[in-house]
């Protein structure tokens, strides 16, 4: 197995550098072939590592950065005026081929702007897309994109997203001929806006896609499709709604379990079942949205991720680097262009 190097934006996120550094050390223990580049405030990073790391010091390096992209920074201003930020540094290492991928929990808009500026999109790709996996009723994963990189998408962009999502499902989830669907307000072909209808025709005409038609929002978790395509506006709302529902259910179970003695007894008896359910829907294991369609690998972690959640984002970056996802997407897009020429 070839050695991999990841660049981490240590200063990104809501919970402080210690969360990311803790996840980083766990990743180094999990992946013997992995090296890491820590981009951020050297004093802060060194101070924490001196207290927690010893045997792994030969597998990471620190690149000092004088700036940090804040969560409320304007993306365009961050792109122009924070070139020495930890986020820009991590992306730069991918651009210079000093790292195979980068991971950041920072400002999504700034990450998108900097990644597009430095890495550029693959030939034949109009816009990159944010994609993440979600659990299904049968214990599988469904890939949903776009999650907000492009608010409005024309039919061509939706077609490209379908191809990119299909490649990701093949390479990361190991699914042969992934079932691809478009998120719509109904399953009938007469429903939906013009760009959705046109995209449906384009997907159906492609030999490179296993297109199954439209699905509705309540079908996302029903294991009907392996890849669901939508524009960034609808995709982001769908994702945030799902995350909010999971949090509501978890909190409701906790609250009900404390209501009275009978509830406590029933909760204790049901604990093995609840634990299995939680492991399946735990948001931590679905942390790590990939910014695909670029000439390099960029993975976006939740800003409020725990160290375990950030570790999942690192795992996603490792998998994509091992399977050379950008190259596979490039090849598939080229085949699509040849098919349509």
UniProtKB/Swiss-Prot annotation:
Gene3D superfamilies for this protein: Isopropylmalate Dehydrogenase
Pfam families: FA_synthesis
EC number, as in UniProt: 2.3.1.274
Pathway(s) of this molecule: Lipid metabolism; phospholipid metabolism
SUPFAM superfamilies named among the record's database cross-references: Isocitrate/Isopropylmalate dehydrogenase-like
Catalysed reaction equations from the record: a fatty acyl-[ACP] + phosphate = an acyl phosphate + holo-[ACP]
GO terms for cellular component: cytoplasm
Alphabetized InterPro entries for the sequence: FA_synthesis, Phospholipid_synth_PlsX-like
Function summary: Catalyzes the reversible formation of acyl-phosphate (acyl-PO(4)) from acyl-[acyl-carrier-protein] (acyl-ACP). This enzyme utilizes acyl-ACP as fatty acyl donor, but not acyl-CoA.
Subunit structure: Homodimer. Probably interacts with PlsY.
Family indicated by similarity: Belongs to the PlsX family.
Protein name listed in UniProt: Phosphate acyltransferase
Gene that encodes it: plsX
